[in-house]
Each structure stands twice: as structure tokens, then as C-alpha cells.
Design a protein with these regions (language model features):
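Compositionally biased, charged N-terminal/linker segments
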Residues: 1-46, 117-124, 128-131
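Short beta-strand or tight-loop elements
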Residues: 46-48, 63
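Short, charged beta-turn/beta-strand-edge "cap" motif at the junction between a beta-strand
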Residues: 54-59
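Aromatic- and Lys/Arg-enriched surface recognition patch
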Residues: 60-131
Length: 131
């Protein structure tokens, strides 16, 4: 299954670009295995993908990660009590960094939080990521 996952990182880089996109690319290349926070439990499984979209300054899908297993409970943050481990794909994230998918091209133009990728959008995401 494929999921859209919102990240809200730094708004803009000094050159007007997205520092969030750069940060995601750096993470993919240096520390790709991460724990991602969830506000609710989702029926995720090993092999599912997180398509990570940056909320600002532009709304676009800029990275992809493969989920390692089901979400698990994590103490410490009552607003986001769940975590899921996923590994960013350096090659696919690099391709998305260079040619991101703007949300206005997707059927779900206003995703809220973590939602499933619509079937109509998957081919575009896979193509842009080189998968």
C-alpha cells in the first residue's frame, strides 16, 4: 500500500527554494532509516511506501521511503503516540528532489495528515521516482 505523509519542516531556504526538500535529500543520503511520527494507528505493513510531501513553501511530494513493519506505540508525545520505521530511498528521493510532484497534479490535492495514495496518482509518483 502507498501512503501520503506530510512533513512540516523549515519554510524556505535563503535562495527561495525549499530547505525541507534539501533536508529530506540529505537524510536519504546520510541517515535513511527513520522513525516517522503518526497521530493515529494505520494499517501499514512491511513493503508499503510513504510518499513524503512538503507542506510549505510549496506543496509537493519530494521523497519516498519503504516501511519496515507495522506502526508501534511510543511514549512521550500524546499528539503523535505512534511511530513507523521506514527507510528513505536515496535514488528515488534524489529523483523526486529534482522533479517533485506538485500536489495540484494529484487527485487528492488537499491531503490531511497521512492518507492512502489514490490509484489514479500512483503511476505518476512511481514514474517521477524512477520506480
Amino acid at each position: 500500500m502507498d501512503w501520503l505523509f506530510i512533513v512540516k519542516l523549515a519554510a524556505a531556504a535563503p535562495d527561495g527554494g525549499s530547505s525541507a526538500k534539501r533536508h529530506l535529500l540529505e537524510l536519504a543520503e546520510t541517515e535513511p532509516r527513520r522513525e516517522w511520527c503518526l497521530s493515529r494507528w494505520r494499517r501499514m505493513a512491511a513493503g508499503d511506501r510513504l510518499w513524503i510531501y512538503v507542506a510549505s513553501p510549496v506543496r509537493e511530494v519530494a521523497a519516498v521511503a519503504e516501511i519496515e513493519g507495522e506502526p508501534f506505540e511510543a511514549a512521550g508525545n500524546p499528539r503523535q503516540p505512534w511511530r513507523v520505521r521506514a527507510t528513505l530511498s536515496p535514488a528515488a528521493t534524489r529523483r523526486l528532489h529534482n522533479d517533485p510532484v506538485p500536489l495540484h497534479l494529484l487527485a487528492n490535492r488537499h491531503p490531511q495528515g497521512v492518507t492512502r495514495v489514490k490509484d489514479a496518482d500512483l503511476a505518476l509518483l512511481l514514474r517521477r521516482a524512477g520506480l
